[in-house]
Amino acid sequence: MIAKHIDDILKSPSNGVIRKMFEEGAMLKKQFGEDKVYDFSLGNPDLDPPKEVLKAIKKYSKEKTQGCHGYMSNAGYQSAREAMAAKTKKEQGIDVPWQNVVMACGAGSALNITMKALLNAGDEVIVPCPYFTEYDHYIHNHNGEIVRVKTKEDFSLDAQAIKDALTEKTAAVLINSPNNPTGRIYSDDEVKALADVLKEWGDKTGRYPYIISDEL
């Protein structure tokens, strides 16, 4: 017997929908030919990695330094964390100490780690609709509850709708930009309006919900 919550996930209609579509697409391509099947499931890149990346991988795969392929810090290599902190400062003007940067293997891993760190049982995470369906599982994996809110007609964030959905159990608001599946990119003004709503709520209640931003 497996854990009930895992059994519930496996039986859920939304479980792995995108992966199921991908597998179905692969089968149909074999049956009818790749040129006759349009796959809108996984967000596989259309372009190959830059040559510089491939060169670096080849270089480090031949690295002879003792221990270079051993275990690393749980948060990732310092050089990678420093590079990400510098990138954030350059692109967003935010001075993030590299010690505050944690590397993860993909967004799914990063979001699960984040939910584990933030959620107590029964805490709520507000998610604007439509959204990436795996968010349901990322939140439920850590005993949280997803609270769905509508966006505006153009799929922009509706700060008032999010404000109306806030409760004493709200731990975070999870946004995704560019949004999957709409492609909407949230503007600075939208995100600032959301931040203002959450700060106002925190000033009032003493609990400041986090903004979790899943970005590409």
What residue ranges belong to the model's regions?
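Conserved core of the PLP fold type I
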Residues: 66-206, 212
